[in-house]
Structure formats: C-alpha cells, structure tokens
Swiss-Prot record:
GO BP term, pick one: premeiotic DNA replication
Quaternary state and interactors: Component of the mcm2-7 complex. The complex forms a toroidal hexameric ring with the proposed subunit order mcm2-mcm6-mcm4-mcm7-mcm3-mcm5 (By simililarity).
Species this protein is from: Caenorhabditis elegans
Function description: Acts as a component of the mcm2-7 complex (mcm complex) which is the putative replicative helicase essential for 'once per cell cycle' DNA replication initiation and elongation in eukaryotic cells. The active ATPase sites in the mcm2-7 ring are formed through the interaction surfaces of two neighboring subunits such that a critical structure of a conserved arginine finger motif is provided in trans relative to the ATP-binding site of the Walker A box of the adjacent subunit. The six ATPase active sites, however, are likely to contribute differentially to the complex helicase activity.
The enzyme's E.C. designation: 3.6.4.12
Native organism taxonomy: Eukaryota, Metazoa, Ecdysozoa, Nematoda, Chromadorea
Protein name: DNA replication licensing factor mcm-6
Length: 810
C-alpha cells in the first residue's frame, strides 16, 4: 500500500501478451517462405525509410509457423496488438545499423495482417466480435481528410516540471493519473510537450455493405473504419474493399451535449466557486450514466477486392506502362495474355464469354467491350484542354430486348461500376451532394454515382425517364468529365472520369422505325451528341431468332450450363486481366489512319446533309472524336501500339450501324409537278371521268393511263435506283475524263436504265410504269435531294453528279 501511496501503482504484467511478443519476434526473425528466404527480415530493413512504418504479415504464414500463436492473435487481437508492435520495434532495432537506430528509436511501427480465411458480414458485427481479428468487405461511400492523431503523449507537470513519457492515447485525450514525481501531488495540471510526443496519420472511412450480402427487403448498413499509418489514402469512394481488423467500442462524444449530462454537470458545480474554465463538460464521466457508445472498426489492413494483374485495380493500372505491368506478372498470366492477344477471333470470343446468357446483338456487345477498353485521354499542348478517352454508350429499344441484362452484366464484371436508375436518381444523387457532417457539423461533399464510378462505368437504367433538370446536371460530367459544385459555401471541381452506359425505352413503348431516333427517345440534342454509340434494339418477329432466344432462356431456367461452356472461350478473371493490360497501351494514330478518319467523317457529314439520308441525329465534330476513341479502343483490344486503317474502318462500320438504322417510309412518285405525257389516274376513279374526259386535247386523250399505286416504291428501292444511276454517270465520267465530260442527257439516262431491265418488262404498261418511275426519281434527285445537277436546263436537261455526293456503304 505504501508503494501505491508514495509513487506510481505497480502494473500487472500480461503474461500472455509477453509470450505473444516473444513468439512473434521469433517469427519475424526466423520464418522462411517457399523460396527459403527470410522475407520478413528484408521487410524490416525497409522500415528504415521515412515513408515506411508498416510491415505486412500473411496470416497463413503465422498459422504455418505456430498454430497456437495465430489462434491467440485471432481471438485476442486488440489485447496483444501492442505487444506485436513492440516485438516489431525491437526486432527492427536489432536489424538496423548504429546510425539508423537513433532514427528508429522514436518511430511508431505497425503490423498489418492480411489473408484471413473467414469473412464476416457487416450486418453480423456484434458485441461478441469486439477485440477479435475479423475480415469484412464493403464499398467505400465516404472518406474523411487525413489528420494527425496523438499516439504517445509526453506531458510536463506544471507544478514540479517532471516529464511523463509514453502516455498511450485511446481515441481521446488522456492525461497521466498523477505526476511521476513521488513528492508532487499534482493530478490534473499537465501540459503537452508536442515536440516529444508521437503523432501518426489518422483517417476515418465509411463503408457500406455490398448488394451481395444484403438480405431481402433490408437497407444497407454502414460502419466507420479507422485506418492509420500507411493505410491512409489507399482507397477512394466507390472502391470495393476487403478490410482486416477488429471491432472496437468507443464513447460517442457527440452525446456529451445531451440534456441529461448538462443537468448533471450543473448540479455538481452548483454553489461551487471556481474560476477554472472548462471546454466540454462531463469528460471525466465518460462511460457513465446516460452516455452512449458506438461501434467502429479499427483496420490494420485494407485493399481493393477487385485487384488485377500487378495488384492494382483498373483505374490505377491505366496510369502505368504496359512493360512495367508485364514485368510484375506471373509466368502463367503472361502465357494466358500472350495466347489471347494472338487470337484472331478475339473480338467474338471475348464478347461471347462476357455475355453468355444474352443471345445475338454482336454489335451491341462489341460496343460495350470497346467502352470497357476506352480510348486514350489526352491534353492539348497549347491550351491544356482535356480530351476524354472514355466511351459513352446508349441502348434504345423495345421492352424485353436485354438492355438491363447488359447493364447488369457490366456491373458484375467491371471492377468499379455503379448501377442506378434514372427515375429514382436526382441530380445530386448522380453528381455530388453537400451534407452536414454529424461530428464536425461542417459541410462536406457526399459522392454521387458518377463520382463513385470514377475510372469505371456508371450504368444508368431508364435514362429517358430522368427529369430534364437531372439530365442537364450530367452534361459536364459526360464531356469534360468533371463535376462543379457551388453550394452551401462549398466550391469544388471533382473528377468524374467514368464511362456512361445508359438504357432507354422508346417514347410510345415500341420503336417506330419510320421515324428518326431523335423522335423515338425523350432526350435532348446535347445529351444525344455526347453519346459515342447509339444502339437500337428492335423486337422483330423472326422464327429462327425467336426459337434460339427461347432455347437460351429455357436453358438458363433449367440450369443447363451447356451454352456457357460452349460460348465461354475465356474465363472472366482472364478477361479482366487482359482488359487491364490492354488499357495500359496508348496507341498513336498513323498517317494512313488519320486520312481514313477524315474520309469517314466526311462521309458521315455528307450523309447528314443529304435529305435522303437515314441519319438518326445531327452529325457533329463529336462524332469525329468518337471515331478516334473507338479506333483507339480497337487498337487496345489487339494490344497494338498504333491505330491502323482496319481499326478505323471497323470503328466507322460500328458507328454507321449505330447511327444509320432508321427505316424510311415508302416514297410516292405521284406529284403533279411533273411535265410529261403520261396521265396518272386512280383505278377506282377511272369510271368517274364522265364529261371531263372530253375536255382533254388529242395528246392527253392518247396518253397512257397508269395506276397511282404502281408509282409507290419503298425507300430501299428508291436508294437502289438512285445508286445505279449515279454509278453509271460516274463510270461515264471516268471513261471520258473530267476535262472532256459534259454530262448525260436525261433521256439518254432513262433509255440506258430501261435497256438494263428490258428482260423484266413483259407488257407495254410495265414499260410505261418503269419509265415514269425513272423520270420521277431523277426529278427528285435534282430538285429535292440535290444529288444531281443540271448543267444545261430545258425539256431534256444535261445532268451530272454533285461532286461531294457519297454513296452510303460504297
């Protein structure tokens, strides 16, 4: 008792902790891996570097070394962790040189444990897990700024000046119980010596349980995770992570201001004269009476779940060079990627392996694959303007055409993907919201779907159901790939470097093929121009296709995996590694590819300016950038360092299929503007002429009569006839030479056409019908479509082809 009164109380030695410290020290010094190397000895030598303070221990190595030691650490982790850190500190000092020991003596070191077998769901974290080592998984929804935390404090007594060192701080400011000087009776008046105290990096992260762990009808739960040392700033909002650590219980400091505590404090101080100023009252009574506790997760190791080749996720991999990534791969991975890159049918094989449950729609699947690969992001030399490399894709079509299925498949496959619905999402939910922090009461930015999908894919279903004001909010994110916020005193520009995969339904439920795309979807022109690819999925009645789709669906319901084995040439993990490796390539555009790009863009512009074209929406310079991005993605797909002509042609073909996919109505060639000697009458009105027929002159009476229905041709027939006439005129021009060519007479052109189809003309009426159709098609090409030009006007004009006219799919 005299020892307790006169000086410090005697501390009880933790024998179990000391035993763990000794055994863990032996493990660090003597453990050898499969290559018979002391891996942890070399790791301890690296701790001398100023930025290193954590050693990473594989739990399987601990079990292999001593099952008893590993079990003790797993069951009593929070109790023995300080002893493990002390063992690491002493072992590191032994491994250091004399010059390095002084530097390492005051350094705070940490032990990070990973590769724990059992995984606990966030919902299962309860009081029985407190203090034990557990592994949880979740998605990061918020990260707080990194700030210094007082780890070991050094206090100076204000009465006698004696210094008390190494006072451990447990999540709150903790002073010594009494002065270290036995003659000094001070218990409260201490000042902190900042220079002699130890501070460490501290960050709080909030994770949310994943959808796979979510029970039916439940709301996702969140838990606060505390990370220190090298673990800070290793993850970002949106990452799916595996976290190893322990569940701890900490006092809820925010509850100190509850009415019950204020009343208690005022009763204690009532009638007591004191001039001591206090900040937060009630700190001495932490854990007493109506103060509540809250749970938090103290992490010792955190890493992204979807780690790819080289140990990084897709967003980080793209920043590295492909040669560096290749050097980090295992021999098995190298062989697999080499085999895939040499595959001549890699497009089809990867597409079939990615979407085994979706039948057909090869172009759609290829477009989604190119979106996952992406183009090369660039910055202009002079202005420094950023040019996005991500590809945006929109799927428009009838119900039950597997649009949402494609989105779900991408969400499951992509390492960083967010799935959301347009109708259930607001502008703030898609971009970012400003909310008040529950502890600091300051306004902080809460990441939205596009921020969470940074360096990934944001899948937006029911895109057409979004309100117009919400669509406007993502204009900036889709083109500049940033989100600007100015609200509640917070002004920030945030990154949203995500590809957008959207699905939309037509206006009236079914796609009207007789109308252009812009009239079939409820989207503004600025939004439509920001999509690189538009795919129209029409539910057509086709016996062969319907049978194949029905067979595929029934196979899925009957749990028959034959189609999966047949279609899946590659494993999903291999495809992930291949895409991550391919994204490291930054292909350059060759001179021939640049010429092809210009030529294909001019084709698109000419088709858009032509009234007879089947363009879905306005072709702008953004479509040229889309061509560049798609060409780069195709080059990446083949792991190419250069964009070739075939890549550009394939990209142009894909863009054409997504743009020019509108059926035009039949064309009626029965206008009254034509001046010819053929009288067009309707069959049901022939007998109603009566006395009116007496008014016609001799020429008109002798003119042949043609049924109006026979002068109605489909748009496809019209295009075929116009292309035949244009090709004939251009061949004449090539044969005669540009200098000698004067054009073709209309009558000669009609006669040539009739001579080519002479074998199909059986009656005089057929001859008159085809002649009239040809003349009226020529008239439309001159006056309406402006494909042909009149060199000489008159009853029989001389014609030539417009020099800028380009035949589609020539």
């Amino acid at each position: 008792m005299d020892n307790i009164i006169g000086g410090q109380a005697q501390q009880v030695e933790d024998t179990d902790g000391t035993r763990v410290q000794n055994e863990f020290s032996k493990f660090l010094k003597s453990f050898k891996d499969q290559k018979n190397e002391f891996i942890y000895k070399s790791a301890m030598k690296e701790l001398v570097q100023p930025e290193k303070n954590t050693i990473f221990i594989n739990m399987q190595h601990l079990y292999k070394f001593s099952n008893n030691l590993a079990t003790t650490i797993e069951l009593q982790y929070y109790r023995v962790y300080p002893f493990m850190c002390e063992a690491l500190h002493l072992a590191t000092l032994d491994a250091c040189d004399e010059s390095e020991r002084q530097q390492m003596f005051k350094k705070q070191l940490y032990v990070s444990l990973f590769n724990l077998d059992a995984k606990t769901k966030v919902r299962e974290l309860s009081a029985d897990k407190v203090g034990g080592l557990v592994r949880i998984a979740g998605q990061i929804v918020r990260t707080h700024p990194v700030h210094p935390e007082l780890s070991r404090a050094c206090f100076v007594c204000e009465d006698c000046g004696v210094t008390t060192r190494d006072v451990q701080q447990q999540f709150r400011y903790t002073q010594p119980t009494k002065c270290a000087n036995p003659q000094c009776m001070n218990r409260t008046r201490f000042s902190l010596d900042v220079n002699s105290s130890t501070f460490v990096d501290f960050q709080k992260i909030r994770i949310q349980e994943t959808q796979a762990e979510l029970p039916r009808g439940s709301i996702p739960r969140t838990v606060d995770v505390i990370v220190r040392g090298e673990m800070v700033e290793t993850v970002q909002p949106g990452d799916k992570c595996d976290i190893v650590g322990t569940l701890i219980v900490i006092p809820d400091i925010a509850q100190l201001s509850t009415p019950g505590l204020r009343a208690e404090t005022s009763n204690q101080n009532r009638g007591r004269a004191t001039d001591k100023s206090e900040g937060i009252t009630g700190l001495k009574a932490l854990g007493v009476r109506d103060l509540t506790y809250k749970m938090a997760f103290l992490a010792c190791h955190i890493q992204q779940t979807e780690s790819l080749v080289g140990g990084d996720a897709s967003g980080a991999v793209e920043e590295t060079d492909y040669l560096d990534l290749w050097s980090k791969m295992s021999t098995e991975d190298r062989a697999t990627l080499k085999k895939m890159s040499d595959d001549k049918k890699i497009e089809k094989n990867i597409v079939d392996s990615l979407f085994p449950n979706i039948y057909g729609n090869h172009e759609v699947k290829l477009g989604v694959l190119l979106m996952l690969l992406g183009g090369v992001a660039k910055k202009s030399r002079d202005e420094g303007t950023s040019l996005r490399g991500d590809i945006n894709v929109c799927l428009v079509g009838d119900p039950s055409t597997a649009k949402s299925q494609v989105l779900k498949a991408v969400e499951e496959f992509s390492p960083r993907a967010i799935y959301t619905s347009g109708k259930a999402s607001s502008a703030a939910g898609l971009t970012a919201a400003v909310v008040k922090d529950e502890e600091s009461f300051e306004f902080v930015i809460e990441a939205g779907a596009l921020m969470l999908a940074d360096n990934g894919v944001c899948c937006i279903d029911e895109f057409d159901k979004m309100d117009l004001k919400d669509q406007v909010a993502i204009h900036e994110a889709m083109e500049q790939q940033t989100i600007s916020i100015t609200k509640a005193g917070v002004k920030a520009t945030l990154n949203a470097r995500a590809s957008i995969l959207a699905a939309a339904n037509p206006v009236n439920g079914r796609y009207d093929r007789s109308r252009p795309l812009k009239y079939n979807v409820q989207m503004s022109a600025p939004i439509m121009s920001r999509f690189d690819l538009f795919f129209v999925l029409v539910d057509e009645c086709n016996e062969v296709t319907d049978y194949a789709i029905a067979r595929r669906i029934l196979d899925n319901h009957r749990a028959i995996s034959e189609h999966t084995e047949r279609d899946s040439v590659y494993k999903i993990d291999d495809i992930k590694k291949y895409i991550a490796f391919a994204r490291c390539f930054k292909p350059k555009i060759s001179d021939k590819a640049a010429e092809t790009l210009v030529r294909e863009y001019k084709k698109l512009r000419m088709s858009d300016s032509n009234n007879a074209a089947t363009s879905s929406w306005r072709i702008t310079v953004r479509q040229l950038e889309s061509l560049v991005r798609l060409s780069e993605a195709l080059a990446r797909l083949h792991c190419g360092k250069e964009v070739l002509v075939e890549h550009v042609e394939k990209a142009a073909e894909l863009l054409n299929k997504s743009i020019v996919r509108v059926e035009q109505p039949d064309i009626a060639l029965d206008d009254d503007d034509f001046d010819n000697n053929i009288m067009v009458v309707e069959a049901d009105k022939e007998n109603q002429r009566g006395d009116d027929s007496m008014d016609h002159d001799g020429e008109k009476e002798n003119a042949p009569k043609i049924d109006i229905a026979k002068l109605k041709i489909s748009f496809k027939e019209y295009k075929q006839l116009s292309d035949v006439l244009v090709l004939h005129m251009r061949s004449d021009e090539d044969n005669q030479g540009e200098d000698e060519y004067d054009g073709v007479k209309q009558s000669a052109l009609v006669e040539w056409y009739l001579s080519t189809i002479e074998a199909d003309l059986e009656t005089e009426e057929d001859f008159n019908v085809q002649k009239t159709i040809c003349e009226r098609v020529i008239h439309r090409l001159i006056h309406q479509d402006h494909v042909l030009l009149e060199v000489e006007q008159g009853e029989d004009p001389t014609l030539c082809v417009h020099p800028n006219y380009v035949i589609a799919d020539e």
